[in-house]
């Protein structure tokens, strides 16, 4: 016979939520750091094309 599951406590729910938030903060800060390095032309491991090169090749 089917038995309902026990309810998750508030503290456990908050702990899981905080772990998820910390993961997202870490990922967001990495993405922001990469964006800053690209904008300041300091990125050494990320290759990209600039608009100047694209516009010169089309003309």
From Swiss-Prot:
Please give the positions of the paired cysteines in each disulfide bond. Answer: none
Keyword Plastid belongs to the record? yes
Q: Which UniProt keywords apply?
A: Chloroplast, Plastid, Ribonucleoprotein, Ribosomal protein
The record's subcellular location field reads: Plastid, Chloroplast
- Return one Gene Ontology term, BP aspect: translation
Q: Pfam families attached here? A: Ribosomal_L32p
Query: Please, which domain of life does this record's source organism belong to?
Result: Eukaryota
Region of interest (Disordered), residue spans:
1-20
List the GO terms this entry assigns under cellular component, sorted alphabetically.
chloroplast; large ribosomal subunit
The protein's GO terms of the molecular function aspect are:
structural constituent of ribosome
Q: Could you tell me which InterPro entries the record lists for this protein? A: Ribosomal_bL32 (IPR002677), Ribosomal_bL32_plant/cyanobact (IPR044958), Ribosomal_zn-bd (IPR011332)
What the entry lists under PANTHER family is as follows:
50S RIBOSOMAL PROTEIN L32, CHLOROPLASTIC, LARGE RIBOSOMAL SUBUNIT PROTEIN BL32C
HAMAP family, A to Z: Ribosomal_bL32
- Report the NCBIfam families cross-referenced here: rpmF_bact
Q: What family does the database annotate?
A: Belongs to the bacterial ribosomal protein bL32 family.
* Protein name as annotated: Large ribosomal subunit protein bL32c
* Protein species of origin: Angiopteris evecta
Lineage, opening ranks:
Eukaryota, Viridiplantae, Streptophyta, Embryophyta, Tracheophyta
